[in-house]
UniProtKB/Swiss-Prot annotation:
Subunit structure comment from the entry: Monomer or homodimer. Interacts with CAV1; the interaction forms a stable heterooligomeric complex that is required for targeting to lipid rafts and for caveolae formation. Tyrosine phosphorylated forms do not form heterooligomers with the Tyr-19-phosphorylated form existing as a monomer or dimer, and the Tyr-27-form as a monomer only. Interacts (tyrosine phosphorylated form) with the SH2 domain-containing proteins, RASA1, NCK1 and SRC. Interacts (tyrosine phosphorylated form) with INSR, the interaction (Tyr-27-phosphorylated form) is increased on insulin stimulation.
Superkingdom of the organism of origin: Eukaryota
Taxonomic lineage: Eukaryota, Metazoa, Chordata, Craniata, Vertebrata
Taxonomic source organism: Carollia perspicillata
Name this polypeptide is given: Caveolin-2
Residues modified to Phosphoserine: 20, 23, 36
Post-translational modification: Phosphorylated on serine and tyrosine residues. CAV1 promotes phosphorylation on Ser-23 which then targets the complex to the plasma membrane, lipid rafts and caveolae. Phosphorylation on Ser-36 appears to modulate mitosis in endothelial cells. Phosphorylation on both Tyr-19 and Tyr-27 is required for insulin-induced 'Ser-727' phosphorylation of STAT3 and its activation. Phosphorylation on Tyr-19 is required for insulin-induced phosphorylation of MAPK1 and DNA binding of STAT3. Tyrosine phosphorylation is induced by both EGF and insulin (By. similarity).
GO BP annotation list: caveola assembly; endoplasmic reticulum organization; insulin receptor signaling pathway; mitochondrion organization; negative regulation of endothelial cell proliferation; positive regulation of dopamine receptor signaling pathway; regulation of cytosolic calcium ion concentration; skeletal muscle fiber development
Length: 162
């Protein structure tokens, strides 16, 4: 409830000349916040996700707002995106990761212990079923269809106008 005496860890640098090329938050001390250099999306699952200011908000040449409005809008967009994303990940990332882990573990278990043994069993039994089905077809269904075909082959229709 007074004046803040601590130095801020995050600063946003926006120049009049380079505001349109700037799309992320610059840290005051990059080494302090640096990740271990590991790519967090090595399989490019979210490569289609475009959340930069220029990807979301654009003004055509014919309609431009004031430069200061554009700069402030850009800064507020980046700050709010940064803060809200961090806030949401603090509260949602761990529970959602836990739920996704449970779902994928359950699906993996079902696939490994139920679905694949069932499929393999069906594939093992199918040649026998195919042989039995062919025998039933040849012994029962083929003679029945042949008899029905012979009965209907002797039917003749004559149309006449009276």
């Amino acid at each position: 409830m007074g004046l803040e005496t601590e130095k801020a860890d995050v600063q946003l640098f926006m120049d009049d000349d380079s505001y349109s090329h700037h799309s992320c938050v610059d840290y005051a001390d990059p080494e302090k916040f640096a990740d271990s250099g590991r790519d967090r999306d090595p399989n490019r699952l979210n490569s289609n996700l475009q959340v930069g200011f220029e990807d979301v908000i654009a003004e055509p040449e014919s309609t431009h707002s004031f430069d200061k409005v554009w700069i402030c809008s850009h800064a507020l967009f980046e700050i709010s995106k940064y803060v809200i994303y961090k806030f949401l990940t603090v509260f949602l990332a761990i529970p959602l990761a836990f739920a996704a882990g449970i779902i994928f573990a359950t699906l993996s278990c079902l696939h490994i212990w139920i679905i694949m043994p069932f499929v393999k069993t069906c594939l093992m039994v199918l040649p026998s079923v195919q042989t039995i089905w062919r025998s039933v077809t040849d012994a029962v269904i083929a003679p029945l269809c042949t008899s029905v075909g012979r009965v209907f082959s002797s039917v003749s229709l004559q149309l006449s106008r009276d």
